[in-house]
Amino acid sequence: MNEDQFPKAYDPKSSESGVYSFWERSGMFIADANSKKPAYSIVMPPPNVTGILHMGHALVNTLQDMLIRYKRMKGFEVCWVPGTDHAGIATQTVVERHLRSSLGKRRTDFSREEFLKHVWEWKEKSQNVILSQLRQLGCSCDWSRQRFTMDPEANRAVKKAFKVLFDKGVIYRGYYLVNWDPILQTALADDEVEYEEREGWLYYIRYPVVNSEEFITVATTRPETLLGDTAIAVSPEDERYSHLIGAKVIVPFVDREIPIIGDFSVDASFGTGAVKITPAHDKDDYRTGMNHRLPMINILTPTGEINENGGIFTGLAKESARENIITSLEALGLFVRKEAYSSRVGVSYRSGAIIEPYLSKQWFVSVDSFRESLREFVNSKEINLFPPEFIRNYLTWVNNLKDWCISRQLWWGHRIPVWHNKHDEEYVICFDGDGVPEEVAQDPESWYQDPDVLDTWFSSGLWPLTCFGWPEESADLRKFYPTSVLVTGHDILFFWVTRMVLMCSAMVDTKPFADVFLHGLIFGKSYKQYDDNGEWTYVSGDQKREYDKGKALPKNVVAKWEKLSKSKGNVIDPIEMIDMYGADAVRFTLCSCANRGEQIDLDYRLFEEYKNFVNKLWNGARFIFGHISELTSRDLEEGVNKDLLGLEDFYILDRFNELLALIDSHYNCYSFDKIAALAYDFFKNDLCSTYLEIIKPTLFGKQGNDEQRATKRKLLATLLVNILGVLHPIVPYITETLFQKIKTTLGVVGDGLGDAVTGHAVSMLRSEACMIAGYPQPIELSFPQGLRESFAIAEKLVYTIRNIRGEMQLDPRDLLQAFIISSEKKELLDACIPIMCALGGIKTIEQLSEAPKDCIFSLGVVEGIQVGVILPAEHLAKEHARLEKEKIRLENSIESLSKLLASEDFRTRANPNLVQAKEDALRNSRQELQSILDKIASL
């Protein structure tokens, strides 16, 4: 075998693009909606067209590709639909930032159409990069079915869904308190708001009671909102204020008289027991305002400034207004004090702006009619959540679900398909066709389309349907919907997963998927480096990489696992990793740590480890090729002579069957990390470190005959083909490369079927490619009774021999002689001898009835079986001298420690921990000395 046929080192860059082109060119990714095979389908969680793939995308798409490749090889008609998401807020924000930096212009400097042209250009560039990166990763998507959440098909589906819900009265519009992002100037849904604990102040303010000398004092975290106060509330049971219920107070600066009301929701122990009610700017106050029919006065502009209702403070940013109001209250004698106070503050998940409860006219989806079906899908196990620990989270969220605000004040997105009459705001037309409604076409001057767009999650909620052509009754929809599984991160269980269940079931009255696998979120190691002043910066780049790989940390550097963040320097670029280590190493790394919903700790060390495994796979296959290159496919078609199979052969075949059973069970419950661990362990330990080492003497002609050697070679070829099939879903590139080399080496497969051992390998080799070959099947063979127990004894005997060699410090390169003594199990021990010789470094092993008298040996016992290693004569004196030297060292140590511990002065003055440590050292030295004396006696 020369270097051209099989290079010594695997080079991912030289093979990956060619392998992928071969798959795609051959049409192997394309699904057939008319196939009679059982369907297996996945719709890709569409990456946002905001930029490029990150490590989370690499993880989720690796896991999906594993499932798709596994099921394809299992005989399913698989359909994996790729796509991208328009990501309304995120993409518009990125493009606005790009236009400011490149052209020096803001969105409002363009017309809506002009701005959207720039967004579409951005989308095309970003999408092309993303799809190229998915190909690099090895994703076997059906690119002929590629989708975008704002393509014409998606737009038709969105308009249809809106019309269906609108006609049912589920979609409604009205003035409600929404989560307002003053930076992006749009409403957000409740689950788009993140909450942070922040330090602030509690301000105490006095309100003068009308026609009275009294004042009522309230405590508030937001004094600027007093401009919109419409009541003061107290508990009806609070005797301090019961006489004031029904009275009125004057709101400073705006001179508005507002009532003091009694409301049982007031916590009398908070602050002063009296609270200001601002229904237009606080959710709790909004409910109180609705219950008491209070006016709702909005005091803010969409940008977060005080509007015309703010009197002398009009035009000020709310932070400036707060300072000015406090100063003015002090001047009026109405400010009492402030005290430190921490509270949970809502923050926009996109812009980071503090969310402002804001009274605004928005479109909503009423969720009450969906709540029961959302619960039932999961409770009845029609939809299975993995891991099941998330079921409780899901049900809690559904039980507390509030109406969904679906309108966004953006330009990029699906325009709300509603037209308003300019003369009568309540007169609207919802239209899901192309163009405009007929009534609008006849009198366009009297109508305008709603300027808002739909929440991104509205269109994403229809994704499983739109990917297969809904609302058309397509062949794809009939074959591949509902989908088999959704793979995504647990962080969007509520953002997206539940909305898909809601939207899809509302449209077609069935679930969108059978299973949902929620993977954990990726964390990276961040390193804080402190200077002499205690200031710190994050370490990044090559320095971080070295620390990840195990370089010792200096005393001024502290490591911590944290969510991936550019600012923390712990982001790992998946494409950079592919360039450095190859796609297979990246995929194996991600698969190996893809636990069920827990934190995923990822660092460069793991990529190094699995790059080494990929190299091990290449080197192991190269070794096997060196011994099967003379075989032909006809040799495998003939099968193997089962009478020539040894204990080690039955064992490796049995282990392979066990591997298949375990891997199948783990695929069924999405335990990707366990699949990776099993495949890794079988190839590295069972096949290479154990089986190959056992049969090397036979392969190299040092034992056995030609027929036995031929049997081993057939087994090696069979095992290699099968393990490539098992590994293919995880590491598709190298397995395909090796599979093609085997096909080339063995030649065209004929009509022979092989036998129980080689049959499936022969069948696989008839396939054009590994990715469309049948998945390996259990080898139906009559295995010897007690096989596993027998091999376990062989392993224990090998372990004992290795222990003896280690204790006697025998050169591992020296082939020694050994013997075994047992009154029974002779046949078993005969079968164990080749294994013991190969793995224990033994030249010959004899079965004896008693220990030999004419040699020196070291003895061990395993389950009543004595195993002795005969020691070389020249080793005896050397080992005896070494043991005597060690004996003297230990005796001196014992004498020294004994004297120290006998000293009363030491025992009374020394730290008790030190005394205990010395006592432990004395005890250990005595035990070591006894062991040395025993060894000397045995010599």
Curated annotation (Swiss-Prot):
A motif ('HIGH' region) lies at residues 47-57. Its EC number is 6.1.1.9. It catalyses: tRNA(Val) + L-valine + ATP = L-valyl-tRNA(Val) + AMP + diphosphate. GO terms for molecular function: aminoacyl-tRNA deacylase activity; ATP binding; valine-tRNA ligase activity. Residues 873-939 form a coiled coil. ATP binds at K566. It comes from the Bacteria. GO terms for cellular component: cytosol. It is found in: Cytoplasm. One of its GO terms (biological process) is valyl-tRNA aminoacylation. It is an enzyme of class 6 (ligase). A motif ('KMSKS' region) lies at residues 563-567. Keywords: Aminoacyl-tRNA synthetase, ATP-binding, Coiled coil, Cytoplasm, Ligase, Nucleotide-binding, Protein biosynthesis. Monomer. ValRS has two distinct active sites: one for aminoacylation and one for editing. The misactivated threonine is translocated from the active site to the editing site. Catalyzes the attachment of valine to tRNA(Val). As ValRS can inadvertently accommodate and process structurally similar amino acids such as threonine, to avoid such errors, it has a 'posttransfer' editing activity that hydrolyzes mischarged Thr-tRNA(Val) in a tRNA-dependent manner. Belongs to the class-I aminoacyl-tRNA synthetase family. ValS type 1 subfamily. This is Valine--tRNA ligase. It comes from Chlamydia muridarum (strain MoPn / Nigg). The gene is valS.
